């Protein structure tokens, strides 16, 4: 694992080429078909060197939860192990890693009809009134969720209306943890400025590769919008807004790079609190040797 632009893919490919391993992607952007440039999806040459499982498995119009990922990843792990190989899980979506390793609470799946009901109530009464409802049924979640956070507020109310139990009650029970021994590594530059520079350089390369054209094609479909999880991925939202005329090109670049740096900051915050983590420095010689030594 590691922040965006830290060199995870390069190290994983080296590992897959030199050892009996197969790669499983742990990335909430790489799951989407047609989102190749802005997600930094491995190139055709890279995929030929080391095929990645769990990429291009959803249309951008579809949702994909941490629970979906956990089920899919466990199935892939079991298949790889049955082939006598070692699974290598690579990515930066920390919520997916956490769900896989620790298990998940048995929350109900989304119900579009109930979500529509909640949205209609919010349109009529305001989110503050719905927050009052949540405080009555789940004071713990109400304390944690701000009235100005409609996505999380709606989900907490939805869970209660589907199950008759509060999110707090349901999250006290988790599915079983992953039944495998896992050696965990994080890779990141030692200096923050190095990572910031890498992020800016990579976004410039994405634009040269046709990132704006990719977003233009996604917009032209007509069934996608900025409220979808796929279009909330960093870079895609800013390019979309630029194409809508919300700001100029230079501002788009500035906003996209800033959003990516914020993502990297959040990823590093997760990783610094992660237990049993072995750290590698991006670009350092001997990373593969260090990694293999720790795995023995």
UniProtKB/Swiss-Prot annotation:
What cofactor is needed? Answer: Mg(2+)
One Gene Ontology molecular-function label: ATP binding
Where is substrate annotated to bind?
A: 4-9
Reaction(s) catalysed by this chain, per the record, are: adenosine(37) in tRNA + dimethylallyl diphosphate = N(6)-dimethylallyladenosine(37) in tRNA + diphosphate
Checking Pfam families in the record gives: IPPT
Q: Which SUPFAM superfamilies match?
A: P-loop containing nucleoside triphosphate hydrolases
* NCBIfam families, sorted: miaA (TIGR00174)
Which family is this sequence assigned to?
Belongs to the IPP transferase family.
This molecule's function is given as:
Catalyzes the transfer of a dimethylallyl group onto the adenine at position 37 in tRNAs that read codons beginning with uridine, leading to the formation of N6-(dimethylallyl)adenosine (i(6)A).
What name does the UniProt record give this protein?
tRNA dimethylallyltransferase
Give the species this sequence originates from: Shewanella baltica (strain OS195)
């Amino acid at each position: 694992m590691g922040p965006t632009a830290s060199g995870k893919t390069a190290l994983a490919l080296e590992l897959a080429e030199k050892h009996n391993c197969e790669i499983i992607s742990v990335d909430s952007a790489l799951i989407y078909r047609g989102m190749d440039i802005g997600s930094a999806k491995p190139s055709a040459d890279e995929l030929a060197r080391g095929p990645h499982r769990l990429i291009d498995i959803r249309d951008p119009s579809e949702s994909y939860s941490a629970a979906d990922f956990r089920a899919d990843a466990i199935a892939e792990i079991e298949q790889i192990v049955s082939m006598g190989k070692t699974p290598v899980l690579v990515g930066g979506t920390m919520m997916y890693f956490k769900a896989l390793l620790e298990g998940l609470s048995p929350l109900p799946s989304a119900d579009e009809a109930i979500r529509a009901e909640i949205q209609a109530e919010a349109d009529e009464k305001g989110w503050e009134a719905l927050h009052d409802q949540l405080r009555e049924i789940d004071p713990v979640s109400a304390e944690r969720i701000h009235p100005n956070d409609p996505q999380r507020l709606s989900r907490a109310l939805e869970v209660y209306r589907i199950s008759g139990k509060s999110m707090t009650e349901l999250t006290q029970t988790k599915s079983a943890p992953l039944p495998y021994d896992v050696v965990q590594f994080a890779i990141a530059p030692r200096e923050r400025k190095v990572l910031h520079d890498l992020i800016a350089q990579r976004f410039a390369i994405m634009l040269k590769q046709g990132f704006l054209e990719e977003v233009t094609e996604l917009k032209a479909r007509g069934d996608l919008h900025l409220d979808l999880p796929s279009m909330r991925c960093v870079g895609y939202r800013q390019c979309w807004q630029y194409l809508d005329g919300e700001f100029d090109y230079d501002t788009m670049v500035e906003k996209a790079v800033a959003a990516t740096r914020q993502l990297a900051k959040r990823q590093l915050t997760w990783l610094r609190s992660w237990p049993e983590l072995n750290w590698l420095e991006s670009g350092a010689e001997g990373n593969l040797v260090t990694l293999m030594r720790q795995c023995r």
